[in-house]
Amino acid sequence: IGQRFSHVISDAGAHVVLVDIQEKSNKKLENELKSRYHTNPSSFKIDITKKHDVMELQKLVLKKYKKVDILVNNAHSIPRTHPKRDAPFEDYPLELWDEAISSNLRGIFLCSQEFGKVMLKQKKGVIINISSIYGMVGPDQRIYGKSRFDSPAFYSATKGAVVNLTRYLAAYWHQKNIRVNTLTLGGVFDSNLHKNKNFVKNYSNKTIIGRMGKKEDFDGALLFLASDASEYVTGSNIVVDGGWTAW
């Protein structure tokens, strides 16, 4: 979804700064944006859980662009290869919990802290924190069958924390012309991940719209929050979930 957001913002004329620890794919996306939209994107290999890295990123961005209009905190980590990543809650490894808390919360904290300083000096800025419906409600284990919910307890815990960190920052920076909002996403269909037709059917039946989300379903909400169209919106949680949380 981060790649999709990069395209959407670039298409609107923004010079996007891509931040990831995966250098090769990040550079590929940078070149793609540059070629398609004729903007001036950049990509940096940065570990957002390390304060020094984020401080360096701030310096690099300011050196090239002189300002920061929008910060989208979209990064999160779900351990994929650990042998116990799917362990039940009662036996879930503490090291995986700590790893997820670090990437899913510490990264947002550090990026908001360092780029919030820039926005304070500019006297203007927008921060958009990406969360999930499972930061609002518990996952319905019944739709996952024997495999259980694919993303363990830390996912719900950190995504819920994102929503309230947004509210805190919006209130903290009141009257500073820095707007902070959450964009909460419903489940997004991915043909590479969602090969279980029963899961897709069960998930779709729990939404009012009757299907899983498509990546483009979130374009409008992202552009709304990033633009002056939402200048009277801060501390809000914009939920785009096909009606999942409405009943």
Please identify what each model-predicted range represents:
Residues K117, A171-Y172, E231:
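Alpha-helical segment proximal to the catalytic Tyr-Lys
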Residues D86, K146, L223, T234-W247:
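Short C-terminal tail/terminal secondary-structure segment
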Residues T207-F218, A229:
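A conserved structural motif in NAD(P)-dependent oxidoreductases
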